[in-house]
Amino acid sequence: MPVNPELQGRVLPAAAPYLVGREKVREFARAVGATHPVHLDPEAARAAGHADVVAPSTFPVVLQAMTVTQLLAEPDTGIDYSRVVHGEQAFTYTRPVVAGDELTATLTVTKVATLGGNAMVTAESAMVDGSGAHVVTAVSTLVVRGDDA
């Protein structure tokens, strides 16, 4: 079954709020080699003007993965997860993510295209804090390999 082109423009319900934990930020920072003290030490983060440790710039993939999982669970996508590879990732920030943030993400499928027999699905996950203020938007492109790939 090919990827459903009518996915383009679909907005999924907001994912459950995600509480950014200090230890989760530290674990992620260590995993990606982000050694700056603001990622690991609350005092260093406070000295730099932040309320708590600052998540590395790619940390929002944790929450975005939850929204993409919602998309893949939709019965009419035509996306065979066994044929999916990650194509591209980008982030647009309003402010840094810090421990203690409670973020809610809403996914919008912004583009469905075919290139070289493969489907390309681009999705934006807009993340807001508990007050509803925008924090970051994560944009990713999933490549769904075609039958000949």
Swiss-Prot record:
GO BP annotations, alphabetical order: fatty acid biosynthetic process
Molecular function terms from GO: (3R)-hydroxyacyl-[acyl-carrier-protein] dehydratase activity
The MaoC-like domain, residue ranges: 16-117
Family named by the database record: Belongs to the UPF0336 family.
HAMAP family tied to this protein: UPF0336
Protein name as it appears in the record: UPF0336 protein CMM_2793
Annotated source species: Clavibacter michiganensis subsp. michiganensis (strain NCPPB 382)
